[in-house]
A protein has these predicted regions:
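A conserved helix-loop-strand patch within extracytoplasmic ligand-binding domains
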Residues: 120-169
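A bilobed periplasmic-binding-protein/Venus flytrap-type ligand-binding module shared by bacterial periplasmic
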Residues: 127-138, 240-258
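Bacterial lipoprotein signal-peptidase II cleavage site
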Residues: 20-42
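Sec-dependent N-terminal signal peptides of Gram-positive bacterial secreted proteins and lipoproteins
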Residues: 2-26
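Short, well-ordered beta-strand elements
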Residues: 43-55, 73-79, 146-147
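Periplasmic-binding protein-like
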Residues: 157-164, 265-288
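Short helix-initiation/N-cap motifs at beta->coil->alpha
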Residues: 77-88, 175-203
Length: 296
C-alpha cells in the first residue's frame, strides 16, 4: 500500500487548510479535513487487498467496499480457491488482510506454520445445523443410522460438538474445541458417523439418516434453517467466530493500523447486517462486533 505517500499528502492538505482559514481547530476536526482533502483534492487512493474464499464474499463485503471508497480506500477483493493459500499469501505480503476463517483455524495455522498474523476484527458465525430427509426430529434417530459430518478437523470437530449438544454422543472434555471421532466416549444412540468432504454432504442427504451441514453449503443447496432437525447451539463460542486477519507488524504501525481499523468498522455495519438477513436468510450471524481487537 502507498501509506507513506497517502499520509504525507494528507498532512500537507491539512496544513494548507489551516493556513487558509486562519483559525484553530480541534485535532479530530483537523484529521477529518485531512481525509477529505486527500480524497477530494488529490484523488490519491489507498488500496487494501483482502483475501477471501468463495464468491459469496463479494456480496458480504459489498457494503463495506462502497463505504470505504468514500474514504479514499479501495478494498480489492482477492479470491482464493482453497483454505491453505490465504494465510500464506497474507504472511508473505501478497495481500494485506484476509477474511475466511474462524479463530480455531487461524490458531492452528499459526501453530503449524509460525505465521505472524492476528485477528483484528470479528465478522460472523455460520451455523452448522443437523438436517435430515428421513426423520423430523433427533428423537427419531435410531441405532445403526448413518450421520454424515465434515471430514476436516475444524468443521468436523465442531460438527461433533453439535451432535453432542443434540444428545447423540458424549465427547472427552479434554478434546476442547477440536474433537475427533476418537474422542467420542459414549453413544447415546448407536449411530454410525461418516466423515465426508463438507461440500458434498448436502448431496448425500437422501442416502443418510441425517447430516451436519455447513451453513454456506446449506444455503447453496437451498436448505433453510427452520428445516433443521437440530440447530447449532454453540453460536456464542468465540473460538468458532470468523474474523479479519492482518500481519502483526502492520498492526504495530499506527498509520497502517488506522487504515485497517476503518476496514473493520466498515464491515461491522448495519448495511452488512442487512445483507446477512435479506440476502442470505440469516445464515450469517454478526458476533463480537463490540470487541476492539486492534487497540486492545
Amino acid at each position: 500500500m502507498k501509506l507513506k505517500k497517502f499520509f504525507a499528502l494528507a498532512l500537507a492538505a491539512a496544513t494548507l487548510a489551516l493556513a487558509l482559514t486562519g483559525c484553530g481547530s480541534k485535532a479530530g476536526d483537523s484529521a477529518d479535513n485531512s481525509d477529505a482533502n486527500t480524497d477530494n483534492q488529490t484523488g490519491e487512493t489507498v488500496t487494501v487487498k483482502l483475501g477471501v474464499v468463495g464468491g459469496i464474499y463479494d456480496d458480504l463485503w459489498a457494503p463495506a467496499k462502497a463505504a470505504l471508497a468514500d474514504e479514499g480506500i479501495d478494498l480489492e477483493i482477492v479470491q482464493f480457491s482453497d483454505y491453505v493459500t490465504p494465510n500464506n499469501a497474507l504472511a508473505n505480503g501478497d495481500i494485506d488482510l484476509n477474511a475466511f476463517q474462524h479463530r480455531i483455524y487461524l490458531q492452528n495455522e499459526i501453530d503449524n506454520y509460525g505465521y505472524a498474523i492476528q485477528n483484528i476484527g470479528n465478522t460472523f458465525i455460520i451455523p452448522l445445523n443437523l438436517y435430515s430427509q428421513k426423520v423430523s426430529s433427533v428423537d427419531e434417530l435410531k441405532d445403526g443410522d448413518v450421520v454424515a459430518i465434515p471430514d476436516d478437523l475444524t468443521n468436523g470437530g465442531r460438527a461433533l460438538k453439535v451432535l453432542e449438544a443434540a444428545g447423540l454422543i458424549e465427547l472427552d472434555p479434554n478434546a476442547a474445541f477440536n474433537p475427533t471421532v476418537d474422542d467420542i466416549t459414549s453413544y447415546k444412540v448407536n449411530i454410525t458417523i461418516e466423515e465426508l468432504k463438507a461440500n458434498t454432504i448436502p448431496s448425500v442427504l437422501p442416502d443418510v439418516a441425517a447430516a451436519v451441514v455447513n451453513g454456506n453449503y446449506a444455503l447453496d443447496f437451498g436448505l433453510k434453517t427452520d428445516e433443521a432437525i437440530y440447530k447449532d447451539s454453540v453460536l456464542d463460542v468465540e473460538e468458532y467466530w470468523n474474523l479479519i486477519a492482518a500481519r502483526t507488524a502492520d498492526i504495530e504501525d499506527p498509520d497502517t493500523a488506522a487504515i485497517y481499523e476503518k476496514v473493520v468498522e466498515a464491515f461491522q455495519s448495519s448495511a452488512t447486517e442487512d445483507v446477512f438477513n435479506n440476502t442470505f436468510g440469516g445464515y450469517f450471524i454478526a458476533v463480537g462486533w463490540d470487541q476492539d481487537l486492534i487497540n486492545q
